[in-house]
């Protein structure tokens, strides 16, 4: 699974990229539901959210 860190700028680039809808808007940053996140396995070669994040604030946990 992945997690969005405090460096998130709330740009929303990641949310529509998630094939399993694991990303949602939190109060100040976007949140990954780690119980839903599949690391895009079976969908993409790499996590889609990581690929589009302009500030590289999404980390593997």
Curated annotation (Swiss-Prot):
Binding residues annotated for [4Fe-4S] cluster 2, in chain numbering: 18, 37, 40, 49
Chain residues that bind [4Fe-4S] cluster 1: 8, 11, 14, 53
Xref: PROSITE patterns: 4FE4S_FER_1, 4FE4S_FER_2
Cofactor annotation: [4Fe-4S] cluster
Keyword Phosphoprotein attributed: no
Domain 4Fe-4S ferredoxin-type: 2-27, 28-61
Bridged cysteine pairs (disulfide): none
Details of cofactor binding: Binds 2 [4Fe-4S] clusters.
Keywords, comma-separated and alphabetical: 4Fe-4S, Electron transport, Iron, Iron-sulfur, Metal-binding, Repeat, Transport
Function, as annotated: Ferredoxins are iron-sulfur proteins that transfer electrons in a wide variety of metabolic reactions.
Protein name: Ferredoxin-2
């Amino acid at each position: 699974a992945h997690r969005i860190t405090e460096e998130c700028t709330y740009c929303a680039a990641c949310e529509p990229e998630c094939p399993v809808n694991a990303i949602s808007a939190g109060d100040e940053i976007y949140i990954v539901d780690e119980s839903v996140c599949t690391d895009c396995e079976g969908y993409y070669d790499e996590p889609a959210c990581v690929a589009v994040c302009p500030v590289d604030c999404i980390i593997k946990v």
